[in-house]
Design a protein with these regions (language model features):
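Beta1-alpha1 glycine-rich phosphate/pyrophosphate-binding loop at the start
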Residues: 4-55
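Short hydrophobic core segments
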Residues: 5-7, 94-105
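Helical element adjacent to the flavin cofactor pocket in flavoenzyme catalytic cores
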Residues: 53-71
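A conserved short coil-to-beta-strand element within the FAD-binding core of flavoproteins
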Residues: 72-84
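Glycine-centered tight beta-turn/hairpin loop motif at sheet-sheet or coil-to-beta transitions
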Residues: 89-92
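FAD-site-proximal beta/loop scaffold in flavoenzymes
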Residues: 105-145
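A conserved FAD-binding loop/helix module that cradles the flavin
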Residues: 139-182
Length: 182
């Protein structure tokens, strides 16, 4: 199974973590609880009539750790490329196969890797949220600053995760189940 580091613990990062961990991949999510979700009150998230952003985050974190993802409250200080991606915090480094960046409106790590940007400074991505650097995905406000919504970011994270699952499987992957019979 692949190893994946996700920098950012908003809806995009946690959605990607859910899909990947649920399917047996080794996932570490880095976040310092500075997501804009802490200031949100959601009325427009399908399936949830309304919820405070902090409650949403608490539920989402519990869900992803329930599937085996690891949450780290350490800030990522740098990312390098060496037999994969070396993700460094103040106290440790890990090497992973894939990197998903959900850095918000200031994509410092994406820029440090030299990924392509458009004329507005948004990180250029394809429809699967792949950046110009192989195995680096950028989701959320960094890629779509004009479309910053929790549900859009969650969909972007899911899209990136499904692309990684497909690459690892060697064919398209769908992640859904039928309800238990009974």
């Amino acid at each position: 199974m692949a190893s994946v580091a996700i920098v950012g613990e908003g809806p995009g990062g946690l959605s990607a973590a859910l899909f990947l961990a649920k399917n047996g991949h080794e996932v570490t999510v880095f976040g310092t609880d500075k997501t804009a979700m802490n200031y949100a009150y959601l009325h427009n998230y399908l399936g949830i009539p309304e919820i405070e952003g902090t409650s949403f985050q608490r539920i989402a974190k519990r869900q992803v750790t329930g599937f085996g993802a690891t949450l780290s409250d350490e800030e990522v200080t740098s990312v390098g490329i060496e037999d994969g991606f070396v993700v460094t915090t103040e106290s440790a480094s890990i090497t992973v196969d894939y990197l998903i960046l959900t850095e918000g409106k200031n994509p410092v790590l994406a820029r440090s890797l030299g990924v392509a940007e458009d004329e507005s400074g948004a990180i250029k991505v394809d429809r699967d949220y792949r950046s110009s650097l192989d195995r680096v995905y950028v989701v959320g406000r960094s890629a779509r600053p004009e479309r910053s919504q929790a549900i859009i970011s969650a969909g972007a994270g899911a899209t990136a995760a499904l692309d990684i699952l497909a690459l690892e499987a060697g064919n398209n992957v769908q992640d859904w189940e039928t309800p238990p019979k009974g």
